[in-house]
C-alpha cells in the first residue's frame, strides 16, 4: 500500500485526529468531510475501531502499510516493555520524526522532505533516509549550506515547546535524543493496544 499524499486536513477530519500536529484541521470542522460529515459517524465494529486506530497512527507518521507493519513486527521482538509502547518508541526514533520533534520542520511531511533532499546530518554525516533509526546521543543537525532555508528558520521560530526527551541548540541548529521516550511522553490520543489487537488477529 502506498503512502497517502492527498490533503492531510481531509484525512484528519475523517479519522478525527490532527495528523499535522497543529490541530488546525479540526478547529473549525471537527467532523468527517462531505455533505453529511456532521452526522455520519455511527458506531464502529470492533474491527473498525482497531483499523481506524491503526490508520490514525500510520498516517500520523506518514508511512506505507508495509513500513508500518514491518516496524510493528520488530517491536514485538524487543524483550523489555510492552509491544505497543515499544512500537511507538520505534516510531518516535525515525529520523523524519526527530527532525519534526526538534522543531526543524512544522510537520512530519515537511521533515521527511528535508531528510529526502539531503538537508540533514546525523553525527556529521548526511543521511537522506527518513526511516533511519536515531540512537540516544546522536547529533541531528542541519547541513551548513541549508541553514538559511526559510522553511527551517520559520519552523524554529514557530516552536512553542519541545518534548522532554530531546535537547536543541538554536544557534547551531542541532539537537539530539537525550533518552528513549516513555509512554507518557508520547501521543495520548492513540490507544496502541487496539493496534496490537488488530495485527494479532
UniProtKB/Swiss-Prot annotation:
Any single biological process term in GO: ribosomal small subunit biogenesis
Keyword Electron transport among UniProt keywords: no
Lineage: superkingdom: Bacteria
SUPFAM superfamilies noted in UniProt: Alpha-L RNA-binding motif
UniProt-recorded Gene Ontology molecular function terms: rRNA binding; structural constituent of ribosome
S4 RNA-binding domain residues: 93-153
A GO CC term assigned to this protein in UniProt: small ribosomal subunit
Keyword rRNA-binding recorded: yes
Disordered: annotated segments: 22-47
Keywords: Ribonucleoprotein, Ribosomal protein, RNA-binding, rRNA-binding
PROSITE patterns, per database record: RIBOSOMAL_S4, S4
PANTHER family (alphabetical): 30S 40S RIBOSOMAL PROTEIN (PTHR11831), SMALL RIBOSOMAL SUBUNIT PROTEIN US4M (PTHR11831:SF4)
HAMAP family: Ribosomal_uS4_B (MF_01306_B)
Protein function: One of the primary rRNA binding proteins, it binds directly to 16S rRNA where it nucleates assembly of the body of the 30S subunit. With S5 and S12 plays an important role in translational accuracy.
Assembly, per entry: Part of the 30S ribosomal subunit. Contacts protein S5. The interaction surface between S4 and S5 is involved in control of translational fidelity.
Family to which the UniProt record says this protein belongs: Belongs to the universal ribosomal protein uS4 family.
Name the UniProt record assigns to this protein: Small ribosomal subunit protein uS4
Classification of source organism: Bacteria, Bacillati, Bacillota, Bacilli, Lactobacillales
UniProt gene name: rpsD
Amino acid at each position: 500500500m502506498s503512502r497517502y499524499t492527498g490533503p492531510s486536513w481531509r484525512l484528519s477530519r475523517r479519522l478525527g485526529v490532527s495528523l499535522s500536529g497543529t490541530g488546525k484541521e479540526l478547529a473549525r470542522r471537527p467532523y468527517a468531510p462531505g455533505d453529511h460529515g456532521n452526522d455520519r459517524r455511527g458506531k464502529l465494529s470492533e474491527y473498525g475501531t482497531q483499523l481506524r486506530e491503526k490508520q490514525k497512527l500510520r498516517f500520523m507518521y506518514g508511512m506505507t502499510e508495509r513500513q508500518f507493519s514491518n516496524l510493528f513486527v520488530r517491536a514485538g521482538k524487543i524483550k523489555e516493555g510492552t509491544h505497543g509502547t515499544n512500537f511507538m518508541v520505534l516510531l518516535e526514533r525515525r529520523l523524519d520524526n526527530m527532525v519534526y520533534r526538534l522543531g526543524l520542520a512544522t510537520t512530519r511531511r515537511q521533515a521527511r522532505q528535508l531528510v529526502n533532499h539531503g538537508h540533514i546530518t546525523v553525527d556529521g554525516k548526511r543521511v537522506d533516509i527518513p526511516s533511519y533509526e536515531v540512537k540516544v546521543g546522536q547529533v541531528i543537525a542541519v547541513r551548513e549550506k541549508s541553514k538559511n532555508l526559510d522553511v527551517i528558520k520559520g519552523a524554529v521560530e514557530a516552536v512553542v515547546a519541545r518534548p522532554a526527551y530531546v535537547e536543541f541548540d538554536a544557534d547551531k541548529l542541532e539537537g539530539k535524543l537525550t533518552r528513549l521516550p516513555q509512554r507518557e511522553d508520547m501521543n495520548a490520543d492513540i490507544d496502541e493496544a487496539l493496534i496490537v489487537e488488530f495485527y494479532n488477529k
